[in-house]
Amino acid sequence: YFLVDAEKFLQRKDLIYTGRTLFGAMPPKGQELDDHYFGTIRQRIAAFMRDVNIELWKVGVSSKTQHNEVAPAQHELAPIYAEANIAVDHNQIVMQTLKRIACEHGMKCLLHEKPFAGVNGSGKHDNWSIITDDGINMLDPGTTPHENIQFLLVLTCILKAVNKQACLLIESSADPGNDHRL
């Protein structure tokens, strides 16, 4: 997600109406130095992140990490893993909370995949795994060649399915916003 000062946000009708810039100059400098990514979190942003965490904890959503991301004003929050349907709900709660708490801190939270041209975009996704009802992780490679058999078989099946059903996967996941982000 990106955080921008609310006063600056309100000066941009394109941000207000679309959640991203539609015109304007490219950034004067790219992301070559990683100064934002490896920099310390500014106090205002840290206070925002703290308040977001408090609100999320109240509704049972815990985040594993939060940090600066590569692009200027870009940040990340990663919720703790959960079953897919719960994780999707958590993502929705997180996005609503980010927007609400940003307003309380005099900022706007941009959740568009690519709010600014010339810098990294943001992605919202759910990781997945395959676990049996007994709790066995089917994607655990194990530590011995014998333990690798199950992992290799499952991985081979996944790769075969992705190769065979590539068009269906693309149709179910591609959209203009995601293509623009990449």
Regions found by a protein language model. Name each.
Residues 2-111, 116-182:
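Glycine-rich, acidic/polar active-site loops that bind/position phosphate-bearing ligands
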